[in-house]
Swiss-Prot record:
GO terms for cellular component: cytosol; exodeoxyribonuclease VII complex. It is found in: Cytoplasm. Heterooligomer composed of large and small subunits. InterPro entries: Exonuc_VII_S (IPR003761), Exonuc_VII_ssu_sf (IPR037004). This is Exodeoxyribonuclease 7 small subunit. One of its GO terms (molecular function) is exodeoxyribonuclease VII activity. It comes from Chlamydia abortus (strain DSM 27085 / S26/3). It comes from the Bacteria. Bidirectionally degrades single-stranded DNA into large acid-insoluble oligonucleotides, which are then degraded further into small acid-soluble oligonucleotides. Coiled coil: none annotated.
Length: 75
């Protein structure tokens, strides 16, 4: 699957849910939609994990900077 933004992946997932909820959607089509949705969910989960990791890194850096500044005031 080509590079896709988190937002586009979520948008496509919503479309797939709508399509799968239609009574006219065949079993074969539903299976293909499910496979596509699975790939999209993996992309979204990966992006969320990366974002969480980055936030954690930034928070740790901010805490380190704060402690460093605090030590300089004490000495």
């Amino acid at each position: 699957m080509e590079e896709i933004t988190f937002e586009k992946a979520m948008e496509r997932l919503e479309e797939i849910v709508d399509l799968m909820n239609q009574p006219s959607t065949s079993l074969d089509a539903s299976l293909k939609f499910y496979e596509e949705a699975d790939a999209l969910m993996r992309i979204c989960e990966s992006r969320i994990r990366k974002a969480e990791e980055r936030v954690r890194e930034l928070s740790e850096k901010r805490n380190e900077d704060f402690l460093s500044e605090e030590e300089s005031f004490v000495h």
